[in-house]
Amino acid sequence: MLNDLYHMLDPVAISAGPITIYWYGLAYVVGALLTAVVMYRTQRRWGFNITIDDLTSVVVGAVFGLIIGARLFYVVFYGDGYYWTHPLEIFATNEGGMSFHGGLVGGILGGIIVCRMYKLDAWTIADLAVIGAPLALCLGRCANFVNGELWGKPTDLPWGVVFGGTAGDMPRHPSQLYEAFLEGIVLFCILQVLSRKKPLLPQGAFMGVFVMGYGIVRFLVEFVRVPDAQLGYLLGGVITMGQLLSLPLVIAGLVLIIFARHRNRPQCIYLDA
């Protein structure tokens, strides 16, 4: 069934004359909007009242940071030296090549800059952002599936998908959809449940759960996902670059949770609140 679905899909969502809009680009836009909506609704449920202008500024700043960070991390960690001899192609984001790990770092830095400008508490803003972020991750992974990229290893399971092209004619794990479900839907549900606990979890706790949860899921899914062709397996063939970058996330997430509990600072939106 998944195989039939894949072959019915087109990476191009809308094509009208010279205008072409891809599902991958739509995933970024809709993902950012959904994250903003979840942030707004969650902070209202917590009893806060961030202005729409401030929220919009934070989301825009974080998205810009995310795109820059995602691209730079891919160039540095996955490019295998290619971009040092083809520097202009660093800007060719339409050809793919984005790293979640870099997007996370860039998004955080972009968000922090805007928070300082508007005197927002970056810890609470980050917590609010990660409660909605799994929805964006889910859409992004679904777009990867539509594009026929980041596919998994060969499988004889009934939901295997023949991606064709460089993936060959053998059924493969739809690893993109595994991630869409686990780091998207499952992680979103976990964070939603935690966001409704009374009393509220302290600042940094949600960020810790998100980072650790993503790291665990990504590390495990990498076992059935084909590594980037230009890198293959690292450290003697035992680990992928994705796993190598995800292990620090698991550790950082755990440290954040412990730090949040020890610090035990209540959530607040504005620094002068």
Where are these regions (language model features)?
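A feature for loop-to-transmembrane-helix boundaries and adjacent hydrophobic helices
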Residues: 1-273
